[in-house]
C-alpha cells in the first residue's frame, strides 16, 4: 500500500468511520475519556491494518461526528458529492483569485502606461514651451537690435564726421597760422622797405617825404588777405557747427525713440 499523508489518512478515517457506523446502533453521549480511547483505537487500526473495523468505537465516533458537523451523517455517496462540490468551490475560488490578480495586474499596467503617457506629454509640452520662450526672446532681441544698430550707425557716423571736422579745423587752424605768419613776414619786409625809403628820403630831401604815405598805405594792403581767410574759415566753422547740432538732434530723437520702444517691450 502506498504511504499516505496525515491529511489523507484523517479524511480516509472519517469516511471509513461514517461507512462502518451506518448500521451501528446509537448509544448515549460518551465521555471525553471514552472518545479519546476510541479515537486512539481507531487510529491504531488504521495505522496497523490499513482499515477501520466495525465496532463500538466506530459507532461512537460516528455519533459524535453527526452531532458536531452539519453533513456528518450523510452517506458515502453524498460525502463524495459534497467533496466534489467542495473541490469545485475551491477551484472557483482559485479561479476568482487568479482573475482578481490578473485584473489587478492589468490595472497596474494600465495606470503605469497612463502615467508614462502623461509624463511624455508633460515633457513635450515643456519642450514646446521652452522653444516658444526661446523664439520670443530671439524676436525681442532682434527688435531691440534693430534700433540699437541704427543708433550705433548714427553714432559711428557722428564720430567719423566729428573726426573729419576736427581734422579739418586743425588743418584750417594750421593754414590760418601759416597765413598769419606769412602776413607778418610780409609786414616786416614792408616795414624794412619803408625804413630804407625813409632813409633815402632823408638823404634825398624833403620832396621824398610826400611819397611816404603812399608807401605806408602799401604796407597795410597785405593784411586784407588774412582777414578774408579768417572770415571764410569762420563761415565754414559755423556751417560745421550747424551740421553737428543737426546730427546731435537726430541722435537725440533716435535715443528717445529707442527708449520708448524699450519701455513698451519691457
Curated annotation (Swiss-Prot):
Per the record, what is one GO cellular component? extracellular region
Write the signal peptide boundaries. Answer: 1-23
Which segments show compositional bias classed as Basic and acidic residues? 90-100, 154-188, 204-213, 221-266
The protein, known as: Coiled-coil domain-containing glutamate-rich protein 2
Q: Supply the gene name.
A: CCER2
Per UniProt, which keywords does this protein have? Secreted, Signal
Q: Does the keyword Isomerase apply?
A: no
Judging by the UniProt lineage, the source's domain of life is: Eukaryota
Provide the free-text tissue specificity comment from this protein's UniProt record.
Answer: Expressed at higher levels in fetal brain and skeletal muscle. Lower expression is detected in fetal kidney, liver, spleen, thymus, heart and lung.
What are the subcellular locations of this protein? Answer: Secreted
Residue ranges for the region (Disordered) are 90-266
Q: Can you name the source organism?
A: Homo sapiens (Human)
